[in-house]
A protein has these predicted regions:
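Juxtacatalytic substrate-recognition/specificity segment
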Residues: 5-116, 134, 198-205
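Acidic/His/Gly-enriched intrinsically disordered linker/tail segments
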Residues: 67, 72-83, 87-94, 110-246
C-alpha cells in the first residue's frame, strides 16, 4: 500500500513494470511516463551496446518519505536505483524523477560496476546531459570560472567524492565523461568502464595519468564562454539549493 492506504496500481510496457498509487499524479500520467522511459531505454541500450533480458521495475512515489517507506529503509530520497532491476522515484506535481539517470545505472551494470561513484554517476549524467535544466558543460565552465571546480582525478576517491555537493560533482563528471567519449571514442570508454582500477585503467586505455586527463579536460572547458544571463541563473539556483538545505 502507498501513503494513506492508497491502493497500488500497475502498468506494464515493453521494457518496464510500473507501480504507483491510485489517483496519484503518476497514475494520471502513466502512459506518458511509460512512453518517455521506453525512449530513454532504447537510447541507453543503443549507446552501451547492451540490453537487459528483464523488465525494469519502477516504484513511483508521491513523496521522498514514501520512497523510503516503500523501499524499506525509511530514508527519504527523490530517487535511486536498486540493482539488479528496481528503481524508486518521486513523481508529483513539482518533482518528476524520471528520465535517463537511474535507468542508465541499471543498464550500465550489465557492462560492469566500476568502484568509483564518480565514474558511475558520470555515465548517468552523460545521458542526462543537464543538471537543473542547464547543460553539464555550462555548469563545469561556471565552476571553473568561479573557483568551485573540483578536479576529476580527485573525484575518483570515493570519500572525496561524497564530501562535495552533488550539484558540483555530478555535472563535472557528466561533462568529463562526454569529453572522454568525444575525444577518445566510445569503444575506449567502455574499456575503461570495465577496469577494476580506474586510475590505472586511464593510463592503460588512454595513455595518460588521471591528473593529465583532468588538465586536458579543464583546458577544453575553458575554451567556452558562458552567457551572463545563464551565469546569473546558475548562481540563483545554487543559492536556492543552499537556502533549502539550511532551512
Amino acid at each position: 500500500m502507498y501513503e494513506g492506504g492508497t491502493a497500488v496500481e500497475h502498468f506494464e510496457s515493453e521494457h518496464y513494470i510500473f507501480h504507483y498509487g491510485e489517483n496519484t499524479k503518476a497514475a494520471e500520467d502513466i502512459s506518458h511516463i511509460a512512453d518517455y522511459q521506453e525512449h530513454c531505454f532504447r537510447y541507453i541500450c543503443s549507446v552501451l551496446g547492451v540490453c537487459p533480458d528483464f523488465k525494469l521495475e519502477y516504484f513511483l512515489c508521491s513523496t521522498p518519505e514514501e520512497v523510503g517507506r516503500i523501499y524499506g529503509d525509511n530514508d527519504p530520497c527523490n530517487g535511486f536505483a536498486a540493482p539488479p532491476d528496481k528503481i524508486y522515484a518521486v513523481y508529483n506535481e513539482q518533482v518528476t524523477c524520471i528520465g535517463f539517470h537511474e535507468d542508465a545505472h541499471i543498464i550500465s551494470y550489465l557492462v560492469d560496476r566500476p568502484d568509483p561513484p564518480a565514474i558511475r554517476e558520470g555515465l548517468a549524467m552523460y545521458f542526462d546531459r543537464k543538471w537543473w535544466g542547464i547543460q553539464n558543460l555550462d555548469w563545469t565552465g561556471f565552476y571553473l570560472k568561479t573557483g568551485r571546480y573540483v578536479p576529476t582525478d580527485k573525484l575518483l576517491d570515493r570519500t572525496f567524492f561524497f564530501e562535495h555537493d552533488c550539484a558540483i560533482t555530478y555535472p563535472i563528471m557528466g561533462a568529463f565523461t562526454d569529453w572522454l567519449i568525444s575525444s577518445f571514442g566510445q569503444e575506449k570508454y567502455m574499456q575503461l568502464y570495465r577496469q577494476q582500477d580506474i586510475a590505472a585503467g586511464m593510463v592503460q586505455v588512454y595513455g595518460k595519468e588521471p591528473a593529465e586527463l583532468n588538465q586536458a579536460f579543464a583546458d577544453y572547458v575553458g575554451l567556452f564562454s558562458i552567457d551572463p544571463v545563464l551565469e546569473q541563473r546558475m548562481a540563483e539556483l545554487l543559492n536556492e539549493a543552499s537556502t533549502d538545505k539550511s532551512s
